[in-house]
């Protein structure tokens, strides 16, 4: 398995449990590490890997239309989407919600999911 990564992707979505968080889209910083088959490296063919520009563009668009209470639920949504739509075999999703707590630079969540596990 090879890995591609997209780190520091900025996106916005409606997320949070407090009313003031739900008044506007909240900024997020997302890191994705995506496990892909070695075929792309062997064939030098973008058709055999995850097209990261497509992942970024599509994910940003989808998140603007979604609604989550918890970062954990958002991370699970992203992991399921990457595994289901892009032929990935493994994914690590890290989401940071910057500046949400006074005196704390960032809070967030990180999950890993494997396509072969339930």
Over which residues does each language-model region extend?
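N-terminal, polar/charged subdomain of small-to-medium soluble alpha/beta proteins
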Residues: 1-118
